Amino acid sequence: MIPDNMPNAKLGTTAIKHPIPILLAAGMSQRMGGFNKLLLPINGVPMVRHVALTLAAFADMPPVVVLGHEAKQVAAALDGIALTMITNAQFQSGKMSSVKAGLIAAGQAADYMICLADLPLLTVEDCAALCTAHKKAGVGQITVPVQREDGMFARRGNPIIIPASARHKIIKDAANLGCRGLLNNHPDLIYPFDSCADGFYVDIDTQDAFCDTTGKKPDARMTVS
């Protein structure tokens, strides 16, 4: 069941306690058979709005949203939410260009939460648990949700939290490094957050995944015009 992530008020205070969220909403939904998955409905609103509301409720500062593909339509779906929206003109070059653009736009901070826009089950509680885990991480470590089977890593989840030191590395060499490269090449930098919460692992990349998650087949009438 998809949780209702429509809070009435933000949880943050004037003091910045949480990482700055960066929501990656520039992708082309290439496996969705012509649908822009970010505009398909979750709990009656476009998925990108659903996820943005979750991050906005958790964060102390307006999340940074990186737009790209169908930027006008996605921006319209986010109307009325306190966000910092930017457009990545290089979005077709891959996800890391959007990560870099978001990190630059976010400016200096202690930590950043890099979040995908197709996580329909992600909740404020998931974000808070990830943030709590990150406080136990070592200096310079990246906190990553992980699910284990038989004591072994079965899969990594999203969002992840990166510190300022990783931000500098990614901005300097995003094309060759990136979050995945940083994690694969430097496993010592990973601080694993063991969690079985579906919010970290259920994403929507295909029409079948949308149907499995919502119980509905995607339809052109569902998307925002």
Residue ranges with predicted function:
Residues 2, 27, 50, 63, ...:
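Structured catalytic cores of enzymes that bind and process phosphorylated ligands/cofactors
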Residues 2-21, 168, 174-225:
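Conserved alpha/beta core of the MobA/IspD/sugar-nucleotide pyrophosphorylase nucleotidyltransferase superfamily
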Residues 16-69, 75:
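N-terminal glycine-rich phosphate-binding loop and ensuing alpha1 helix
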Residues 35, 59, 79-82, 186:
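Short, structured coil segments at secondary-structure junctions
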Residues 38, 62, 84, 189-191, ...:
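Conserved beta-strand segments of alpha/beta enzyme cores
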Residues 50, 73, 97-101, 129, ...:
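Alpha-helical elements of Rossmann-like donor-binding domains used by nucleotide-donor carbohydrate transfer enzymes
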Residues 82-93:
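Conserved donor nucleotide-binding strand/loop of the catalytic core
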Residues 92-164, 168-169:
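Conserved beta-loop-beta/alpha segment of the NTase-like Rossmann-fold superfamily
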